[in-house]
Swiss-Prot record:
It holds the Pfam family 4HBT. Transcriptional factor involved in regulation of membrane lipid biosynthesis by repressing genes involved in fatty acid and phospholipid metabolism. GO terms for biological process: fatty acid biosynthetic process; negative regulation of DNA-templated transcription; negative regulation of fatty acid biosynthetic process. NCBIfam families: PRK04424.1 (NF003359). The keyword Transcription applies. Gene3D superfamilies: Hotdog Thioesterase, Winged helix-like DNA-binding domain superfamily/Winged helix DNA-binding domain. GO terms for molecular function: DNA binding; DNA-binding transcription factor activity. This is Transcription factor FapR. Belongs to the FapR family. Signal peptide: none annotated. Keywords: DNA-binding, Fatty acid biosynthesis, Fatty acid metabolism, Lipid biosynthesis, Lipid metabolism, Repressor, Transcription, Transcription regulation.
Length: 188
């Protein structure tokens, strides 16, 4: 038996609250209605689409994790983080990131993505870049997506130093690599 619109919308809200990563297709199947009906219900209830719900959940969990800088100061979007171990961020190269004459990304944006990821990775409220050895291996163009992967390769809390290796890729092709020596407070 089909539920009334009001009942369906109440159940839809409950379902999305308990399982925020459920797709519109799965919801349509669960409630035996069309995908368009689910989308209209979400719109009426001001429930964001799946991608926005995922982003919101990720931001909430990362806000509690990142200690060394506010999330809005990270260049790119952190999608994975394990403090003092590894992290991944994504940066969409848009018009504001490139030279207008050739649409090639300015190097400082790639450096900033890698450096801010290295800072965010540190499990300490104080994290500063002491030294960086970087290499740009190919040009990045407007419209490309840069995925930066950082991992801690050496951790010395007694000396207050952490070495972080960051490699950035566009479609699995290396575009940037760097080794960052990070200063951290000795009390963490």
């Amino acid at each position: 038996m089909r539920k009334s619109k009001r009942e369906r919308q109440e159940l839809l809200q409950q379902t999305i609250r308990t399982t925020p990563f459920i797709t519109d297709e799965e919801l349509a199947e669960k409630f035996n209605v069309s995908i368009q009906t689910i989308r209209l219900d979400r719109l009426e209830l001001s429930i964001p689409e799946l991608r926005e719900r995922i982003k919101s959940v990720a931001e909430k969990s990362l806000e509690d994790e990142v200690k060394s800088l506010p999330l809005d100061e990270v260049i790119g979007e952190i999608i994975d983080l394990e403090l003092d171990e590894h992290a991944i961020s994504i940066l969409e190269i848009r018009r504001e990131h490139v030279f207008s004459r050739n649409q090639i990304a300015r190097g400082h944006h790639l450096f900033a993505q890698a450096n801010s990821l290295a800072v965010a990775l540190i499990d300490d409220e104080l994290a500063l870049t002491a030294k960086a050895d970087i290499r740009f291996t190919r040009q990045v163009k407007q419209g490309e997506r840069v995925v930066a992967k950082a991992k801690v390769v050496k951790l010395d809390k007694d000396k207050g130093r952490t070495v972080v290796e960051v490699n950035s890729y566009v479609a699995e092709e290396p575009v940037f690599s760097g080794e960052f020596v990070m200063y951290r407070s000795k009390q963490s």
